[in-house]
């Protein structure tokens, strides 16, 4: 567990693309288990008033697990779709506290 990282990912859809953003994320998040990573939490909002459309909390076994996921050819093959539907992404490390 010493190398484990937890991330918060906030995503904003391009105009009219909130459903397409969710569909894209459904596809790419399904790849996480292949890279020793998982979704801890995923919430979807309206994106109103400048808020993100989707917020995810992800756990990866290590930085190399995250790097493997980000470089997965199944994911990178969808980069045009990602660029079309996602206007902005913020990804940063967090500590989960209950």
Please give the residue ranges for each predicted region.
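C-terminal structural segments of small proteins and small subunits
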Residues: 66, 71-85, 89
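Short S/T/G/P-rich N-terminal loop/turn motif that feeds into the first structured element of a domain
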Residues: 1-54, 59-71, 92-98
């Amino acid at each position: 567990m010493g190398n484990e990282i937890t991330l918060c990912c906030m995503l904003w859809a391009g105009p009219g693309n909130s459903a397409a953003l969710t569909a894209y994320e459904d596809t790419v998040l399904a790849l996480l288990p292949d890279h020793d990573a998982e979704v801890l939490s995923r919430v979807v909002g309206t994106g109103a008033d400048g808020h993100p459309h989707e917020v995810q909390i992800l756990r990866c076994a290590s930085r190399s697990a995250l790097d493997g996921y980000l470089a997965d050819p199944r994911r990178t093959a969808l980069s045009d779709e990602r660029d079309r539907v996602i206007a902005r992404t913020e990804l940063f490390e967090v500590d989960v506290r209950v």
